[in-house]
Amino acid sequence: MSKDTLILAIESSCDETSASVIKNGKEILSNTVLSQIESHKRFGGVVPEVASRHHVEGITTTIEEALNTADTSMEEIDAVAVTEGPGLIGALLIGINAAKALAFAYDKPLVPVHHIAGHIYANNLEEPFEFPLMALIVSGGHTELVYMKDHLSFEVIGETRDDAVGEAYDKVARTIGLSYPGGPQVDKLAAEGEDTYDFPRVWLEQDSFDFSFSGLKSAVINKLHNLKQKNEAIIPENVATSFQNSVVEVLVGKAIKACETYNVHQLIVAGGVASNKGLRQELKKACAEHDIKLSIPSPKLCTDNAAMIGAAGHYMYEAGMRSDMHLNGHSSLDIEDFSVEKE
């Protein structure tokens, strides 16, 4: 009988300090998350310097809590996995330096993990991958379609050419007077409104799987500006509904088209915006109509957390991916560089 593999994972790419212990890539023994939302709310967004300071304050206790909750020790851990990027450099370095210190002190392998690979592998913690598959990544910093023919095989077939979908949500939220984080509040308002504003659906070229949300964002802002100039009433619920319907229609349409083009039967959704109820609802409908298996993680695994880093880190560890003590953080990082081709 083979020995269980225990991965200690650390995530600090943005405004959550998180540590987790993952068993055999599938079982969450602990997943401690220290959120900074309240600290950033008054600024209307994440302030990098504030985020870094909070990571410094919380990283040690977060790791200790993860180990204690998992009822394990560093001696029993097989490897330390940590987010290398993309993310805020100052924030990333707090987690990376903690991981390097532990790996050095306890003579454990150090495994660098791509943040988006982590989001993708959050799905595998709840429902096994069925290859080949298509991954739709929707978050504050990323909007991508990634084709996977096997574990650690990442081919980006589409990505945003300007704003990520989460950025558009936050900007629209601020425009209609909602506080940070805006995405969940827009989603909640959208359930109460009607689609009364004609906002654009940006499909780009016929065969393109790329996305663009800057035009939609500008259309919403301009529409509200014009209404104010004319002293006409603005109904926030209807703005939220019209905006969200425009976003969701494009995301769902391109995801389904990608699945059909690449002949895959499982669509997984990853990233913070994957917890959006409107998006989840429309994806369920579309996937049922096209006989595609849909996999979306629980909301707690959609937002940044270390369990997802441990899930991806397990397969990277098994594939022999390692880093030395020169590991650094990167604000931008190509997920395709983390692909492992099987012989």
Curated annotation (Swiss-Prot):
Keyword Cytoplasm assigned: yes
**Localisation per UniProt entry:** Cytoplasm
Q: How is the cofactor bound?
A: Binds 1 Fe(2+) ion per subunit.
| Main subcellular localisation | cytoplasm
Which class of enzymes does this protein belong to?
A: transferase
Q: Which GO terms describe its cellular component?
A: cytoplasm
Which top-level group of life is the source organism from? Bacteria
Per its UniProt record, the required cofactor names are: Fe(2+)
- Annotated GO MF terms: iron ion binding; N(6)-L-threonylcarbamoyladenine synthase activity
Task: State the reactions this protein catalyses.
Answer: L-threonylcarbamoyladenylate + adenosine(37) in tRNA = N(6)-L-threonylcarbamoyladenosine(37) in tRNA + AMP + H(+)
Which terms does the UniProt entry file under GO BP? tRNA threonylcarbamoyladenosine modification
Keyword annotations of the record:
Acyltransferase, Cytoplasm, Iron, Metal-binding, Transferase, tRNA processing
Known EC number(s)?
2.3.1.234
Any Pfam family: TsaD
Where does this protein hold Fe cation?
Answer: 115, 119, 304
Query: Quick one: which residues bind substrate?
Result: 137-141, 170, 183, 187, 276
Function per UniProt: Required for the formation of a threonylcarbamoyl group on adenosine at position 37 (t(6)A37) in tRNAs that read codons beginning with adenine. Is involved in the transfer of the threonylcarbamoyl moiety of threonylcarbamoyl-AMP (TC-AMP) to the N6 group of A37, together with TsaE and TsaB. TsaD likely plays a direct catalytic role in this reaction.
HAMAP family hit by this protein: TsaD (MF_01445)
Family per similarity comment:
Belongs to the KAE1 / TsaD family.
NCBIfam families, per the entry: gcp_kae1, T6A_TsaD_YgjD
- Return the protein name: tRNA N6-adenosine threonylcarbamoyltransferase
Q: Which species does the entry assign this protein to?
A: Staphylococcus carnosus (strain TM300)
- Source organism phylogeny: Bacteria, Bacillati, Bacillota, Bacilli, Bacillales
